[in-house]
Amino acid sequence: MMVYEISLGSGSGRKRSESKEVVTLNSKSVRKIFIVVLAIKPHNFTLEFEQEGEKVKTRKVAFVTGASRGIGRACAVALAQAGYDVAVSARTMIDGTAFLDDGVTPVPGGLDTTVDQIRAAGQEGHPIQMDLLDRDSVIHAADEAIEHFGRIDVLVNNAIYQGPGAMLTIEELDDTNLKQLFEGNVFAQLGLIRHLLPVFIEQGGATIVNMISATAFINPSEKIGSGGWGVGYAMSKSAFERVAPLLMVEHGDE
């Protein structure tokens, strides 16, 4: 089992430890992310098994969370272009039905349009509604992906919590905001990994890609509103950054 982190921010890719690769990319380069990841992982998951004396290739399947728009959509499409069928999850199923907190300003993107792009790449896409703050929803999404495709070869933990608390100062941040940030940026993703680990081990391995942020390991040069970020967001991303190396130590040989 291989575990990778991809950090979105400025700077070039760099290896941060022997147990994982961290690829740092500008957000404009997200469509190249999985060209990099698929190139450096040790096997390509083109699996074969014997059936009545003939070798039969199995499908390659990826599960990308937070794929209704932006980085998640770009990852899902890149994987489809690399030959993967892709299960995609997000809160927004239909493009044009999501709005900002004001309830008026629309947010473009939905799983329906992501699946259209996956199919345009010649692969099967399967949309699943998922809310990071609802643990039952997260587990259901994993189960539905497995039920539909039969396996998951690549898990991309891209979805993050985007809501109150992310851009608050230390003085402004309260426990409720902090708990939401950790549920949506750490606990949900870790819960998804833990739920799928037995599946990955039984099927003989998988590749896990954790999307993190440069806020996990660098200090802001300015305050919030001038290029800086909230302490709660940075704390949650830093906590999630610790998952990959430990996961690699515990299960890297499986």
Segments (PLM) and residue ranges:
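Catalytic loop of short-chain dehydrogenase/reductase
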Residues: Y161-Q162, D175, T207-D253
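Amphipathic alpha-helical dimer-interface segment in Rossmann-like NAD(P)H-dependent oxidoreductases
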Residues: E147, G184-E202, A216, M248-D253
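Catalytic Tyr-X3-Lys loop
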Residues: D153, E171-L190, G205, V209, ...
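Conserved Rossmann-fold SDR core element
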Residues: L79, V86, R151-D153, E241-A244, ...
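Short-chain dehydrogenase/reductase
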Residues: F49-F149, G163-T169, L173
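Active-site loop of short-chain dehydrogenase/reductase
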Residues: R59-K60, Q123-E124, R151-I152, F200-A214, ...
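Rossmann-fold scaffold of SDR-type NAD(P)-dependent oxidoreductases
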Residues: T65, M130, I152-Q162, N185, ...
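Conserved alpha-helical elements of the SDR catalytic core
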Residues: C75, Y84, A145, A159, ...
